[in-house]
Amino acid sequence: MSSWTPLLRQFQHYLKIERSLSENSILAYQQDMEKLSRYMEKNFPETSPTQVTLQHLRYFVNSLAELEISEYTQARIISGIKAFYRFLMYEDRITEDPSQLLESPKLGRKLPDTLSYPEIEKILESIPLGEPEGHRNRAMLETLYSSGLRVSELIDLKIGNIYADVGFLRVIGKGNKERLVPIGKDALKYINIYIEEFRKHIQPAKGHEQYVFLNRTGKKLSRVMVFLIIKKQVAAIGLEKNVSPHTFRHSFATHLVEGGADLRAVQEMLGHESITTTEIYTHLDRDYLRQVLNEFHPRK
């Protein structure tokens, strides 16, 4: 067995128990660390994880660049490496952190893609309600835009967590953290139509009885299925943008900030732990204000 295997398993356990990270985040860390372990086993087979030096890590990062792996992916992998060696320090497995001086690529701040409100409306109105899944898809996309949910939060939404009388959803976010999120009347209307008139004709699979959005076999929708549904509707209106479920979330936040919403309130609704994550939307807002100035001010 590789000298990396037991430590990577312990790291995975630490991320789950101590850090309370989601399964998706843990999987991402695991896959990135496996890249490093494979590189070390191939090029420095006698070097255990606790013997790795800064120079080893720099060789590995250089190999990523040679494979033309994007700077954003490199930065994510380096972040995972730093987390792993912080864990080894925490466990007293090493006395010095070899990743401490490991440099990440300098990244320009990439602002997320957004949809305008008319584009959102066109996508929603393009959903054919005459098709069996039409009302489900409309309810689903209305919910994404109305509440700014992550796609994982959307597909995990349960009927018992919809509080229609007060206009809130209880969602399970990253790290299994719960939060209450407001939902608009239009989204609630389409959810109600879907549940009362269409979902009742589907026999839920065992263990999937409480999930709101089901496929034809009665199982909750997958992330990939939601992505494909959105791609189909974007193509239907001829919109040449790279739109994903996360685009609806970004658009939700952007439109709130452009409308003057308090950033702390937006942070709470998005489920961001840190306000700095939410602050990216203030940059979007400044771009919007600059656009208004250029369009309407008499002196260009």
Describe the function of each predicted region.
Residues 1-300:
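Conserved catalytic core of the tyrosine transesterase superfamily
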